[in-house]
């Protein structure tokens, strides 16, 4: 069993390295940044994930998928007010973009914190 876990760790590291290489080619690629941020979340590197999510949303506020993950990161770390702020921003952007599914996910998470 230990051998399998080690193999999974190698795959995760390889994935992170591949995503970093792709970002070197196009540092403003929000899709790749988002994917790398999710890998950081999985590995417990919340500061790196937070920076990437915030970079994406500063540059491209309409990249609505990142709001949920950034807010969840803050929520998980006990920063509820910051999580609420990001859920609210995300709901506003999702509504503006007509992203109803994303809006509903954000609203549901927001309501869990505020009601």
What do the predicted segments below correspond to?
Residues 25, 59, 76, 93-97:
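Structural marker of alpha-solenoid helical repeat scaffolds
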């Amino acid at each position: 069993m230990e051998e399998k876990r080690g193999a999974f760790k190698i795959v995760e590291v390889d994935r992170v390295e591949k995503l970093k290489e792709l970002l070197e080619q196009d540092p403003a690629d929000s899709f790749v940044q988002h994917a790398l941020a999710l890998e950081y979340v999985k590995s417990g590197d919340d500061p790196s994930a937070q920076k990437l999510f915030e970079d994406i949303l500063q540059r491209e506020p309409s990249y609505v998928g990142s709001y949920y993950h950034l807010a969840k990161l803050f929520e998980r770390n006990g920063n509820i007010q910051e999580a609420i702020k990001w859920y609210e921003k995300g709901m506003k952007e999702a509504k503006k973009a007509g992203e109803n599914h994303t809006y509903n996910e954000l609203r549901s998470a927001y309501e869990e914190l505020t009601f």
